[in-house]
Regions:
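Inter-lobe coupling linker of SF2 helicases/translocases
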Residues: 155-160, 169-175, 194-208, 238-327
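Conserved Walker A/P-loop ATP-binding site and its immediately adjacent core
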Residues: 93-98, 108-130, 221-224
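Conserved helix-turn-beta segment of the N-terminal RecA-like "Helicase ATP-binding" lobe
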Residues: 119-144, 232-236
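Walker A/P-loop
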Residues: 79-99
Length: 327
């Protein structure tokens, strides 16, 4: 409960009302973010909005979303942070573009940052934004980030982050973090120790809205999901470790379990990936003394809860049906 003075003044009462309003809003956001995608229902107002949405494809044809695409996009628009795991060719680019357009239209953010590998920015995003007549700017030097008009898309390559780190940090601060991050091919940050991952987390983890999209959330093992969760949730209360047991290899090279000292707490910002691996995917050392990750998953119910409220997974066949054959 809020601390209330014995004889509150008019100023105290005004502060108390403002604090209670903030607490109610934060609680609503937390409850919405914590809802599992399979349990959510479509919002009628968002449904009407998405029925009017269209985009132009690379052949110059005006396209609309399918019913299933609109259903998934409706659920994503209700949350601040989400990961769209649609298979290649399912329309991820158009979906996350309209998610960003929605935030700009209703002035929830000032700008949209599109972060993608160099090949995706040049071959996908720049042609897509151009053919849809969208205002955008490609950031190649720090000067490009100094005078960015409100409502403009900012296209940024992951390989340029080291060069643009200082200018981007200033831009985020000037915008009061009222930005939307669209991270295309988010599996680029599967290694939590890489410099690229550290740059991306350091610059974008505190933004108001984030949408990640990729066709392959993990490449080898489940531990690679952690950096994407960390970018989305910033080690907040939405990212609580509910695994009561942790696992590690003993001297006899056998997996043994122990109590989790961080149970009920958010994953720590420092070495949180180590705790995530210990909870869900402990490594085993090979005969050469090198740690090797395997496909085993521990505490699967807790992991499924975290994935269920964050990731929407669809295959290309879900959208196209049996019309196409994948060879």
């Amino acid at each position: 409960e809020l601390p209330i003075p014995e004889v509150p003044t008019e100023k105290n009462m005004h502060q108390i009302r403002a604090a209670e309003k903030l607490i109610r809003r934060k609680r609503r956001e937390y409850e919405m973010q914590n809802r599992q995608f399979p349990e959510m229902e479509e919002d009628d107002r968002l449904k009407e909005y998405l029925d009017r949405c269209a985009f132009i494809n690379k052949d110059g044809e005006t396209c609309e979303f399918t019913t299933l695409q609109k259903h998934d996009l409706n659920l994503v628009l209700q949350k601040r942070h989400a990961l769209l795991n649609w298979q290649q060719g399912s329309g991820k680019t158009a979906a996350v573009y309209h998610r960003a357009k929605y935030l700009l239209k209703f002035r929830k953010v000032r700008n949209v940052i599109i972060l993608a590998p160099a090949i995706a920015t040049n071959m996908t995003w720049i042609p897509f934004l151009s053919i849809n007549r969208e205002q955008f700017r490609v950031a190649r030097k720090n000067a490009d980030l100094e005078t960015v008009p409100e409502g403009v898309f900012l296209v940024l390559s992951t390989s340029m982050l080291g060069k643009l780190k200082r200018g981007m940090a200033r831009f985020v601060k000037r915008s009061s973090r009222k930005l939307c991050l669209v991270f295309d091919e988010s599996d680029e940050i599967t290694n939590p120790s890489s410099q690229r991952t550290r740059h991306i987390l350091g610059l974008f983890r505190r933004l108001k809205y984030k949408i990640l999209d990729t066709g392959t959330t993990t490449r080898n093992n489940i531990a690679e999901l952690y950096s994407q969760f960390e970018l989305l949730y910033n080690n907040s209360i939405n990212m609580v470790c509910w695994s009561s047991r942790v696992y590690h290899e003993n001297r006899d090279k056998e997996i043994e379990e122990d109590n989790n000292p961080h149970y009920g707490e958010p994953f720590p910002a420092f070495r949180g990936h180590v705790l995530f691996r210990a909870c869900h995917c402990p490594g085993k050392s090979t005969v050469f003394g090198i740690e090797k990750q395997n496909q085993d998953v521990y505490n699967k119910e807790e992991l499924a809860g975290l994935i269920g409220k964050t990731v929407i997974t669809r295959k290309f066949r879900d959208f196209a049906g049996e019309k196409y054959k994948i060879r």
